[in-house]
Amino acid sequence: MSQIPTMTLGPVLYLWEGEKWRDFYFRIADEAPVTQVFLGETVCSKRFHFTEPHLAEVIERLENAGKQIVLSTLALVTLERESRHVRGLIADSPYPVEANDLSALGMLRGTPHVIGPMVNVYNAATARLLASRGATAICLPPELPVESVNRIVADTPDVEFEVFAFGRMPLAISARCAHARSKGNIKDNCQFVCKDDPDGLAVKTLDQQSFLALNGVQTVSHTCQSLLGELHDLAQAGVSRFRLSPQDCDMVAVARIYDDVLTGRCDADDGIAQMQRIYPGVPLSNGFHHGREGAAWVARARNTAHGANL
């Protein structure tokens, strides 16, 4: 590992009131040890008007704090106005763009850009193809097992790889809005009910066990992926960036814990214990990383004589 990897902050996936969204990023700018911040609505174009009035001042605050800015595209484009928005974003943005939908790739060809975690990069051949078209960094999908991550990174030189290290995992997106339907509304008259669930709406089994969460037209995991115990192994394998996906909790504290573990100021086990206090009520998981079901938690085995991970 030639240098300590950096941390990035992904776009807010949920619908927050504009002032809350603005103040969240103001605090990130002033206090969070992240080097790069992704901004933009990736889930539902109907949410644009909540955040766009605050975007310029958020960017200014982040840039004044030395943060790098990347603008993220929608993850599903179904309407002409959404297509126009993506085209305009790519044509006019003074910042790098993160593609979260294949429809953006043709417009980005030949321009340095980032591939987001909602684009299915499942092998090195795909990563190399994207790199040949201008991708300089790729955030791998959170469902990839570590063996696949290692192989893709090893077989794709000259690309920065990012791993989804914290947050509820984006699993699916639809043209229909199950969140609105769950509240008795339709998508065209949703009344923005997803705003009432700033961390997602729990979906339960018949046995009343939470197993997914709704976020407008998006489905995310009930559990929160946390790769604190895997950071150093991933860094040794060549992963250069770790993405923190905003949840409705103290994300500055989350970023500090990850920074402390990465730099060796804190043991991963202590970091996990702190994380559970910061984000209570949502189970942590790392199952996908270990080739298990995504909701599983695989505890680290320790060599008690040497304190090494097994």
Which residues does each predicted region cover?
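Active-site pocket-lining/capping segments in soluble small-molecule metabolic enzymes
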Residues: 1-121, 139-140, 146-310
